[in-house]
């Protein structure tokens, strides 16, 4: 009778133990996750003021703030509103109350002479009814 050959137990690894390949993958995945978090932290960091005042192409792409201000021309600063000079109220001159309302505002209604001339032109234009 022959006895079957048994493999030494030390050479067989149970399935649930992590292999060296998976542990290296886990380490690289963790490093990539850390790098991604750092990049996101840098991206969401508030913009710092830049004192560069040159508008050349190189300086316009210097940082995100320079690009938004110089490259795109966007500025989120409050613009100062112009203050109007107060209007001077004019006091009516003494001759103003003597004038009638129509002469101050302009003649909006035709006078009697203008009415007569407009009626005469209407009669002449009607004519025989061609």
From Swiss-Prot:
GO terms for cellular component: host cell nucleolus. This is Protein Tat. Residues 100-109 have a biased composition (Polar residues). Residues 79-90 have a biased composition (Basic residues). Its main location: host cell. Residues 67-77 are annotated as: Core. The modification Phosphothreonine is found at residues 85, 89. One of its GO terms (molecular function) is RNA binding. It comes from the Viruses. The Arg-rich RNA-binding region binds the TAR RNA. This region also mediates the nuclear localization. GO terms for biological process: positive regulation of viral transcription. The phosphorylation by CDK9 does not seem to be important for transactivation function. The keyword Transcription regulation applies. Coiled coil: none annotated.
């Amino acid at each position: 009778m022959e006895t079957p050959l048994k493999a030494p137990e030390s050479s067989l690894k149970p399935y649930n133990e992590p292999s060296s390949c998976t542990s290296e993958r886990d380490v690289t995945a963790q490093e990539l996750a850390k790098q991604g978090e750092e990049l996101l932290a840098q991206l969401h960091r508030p913009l710092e003021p830049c004192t560069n005042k040159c508008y050349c192409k190189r300086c316009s792409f210097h940082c995100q703030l320079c690009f938004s201000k110089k490259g795109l021309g966007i500025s989120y600063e409050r613009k100062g509103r112009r203050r109007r000079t107060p209007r001077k109220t004019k006091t009516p001159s003494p001759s103003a109350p003597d004038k009638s309302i129509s002469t101050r505002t302009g003649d909006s209604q035709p006078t009697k002479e203008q009415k007569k001339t407009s009626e005469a032109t209407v009669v002449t234009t009607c004519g025989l009814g061609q």
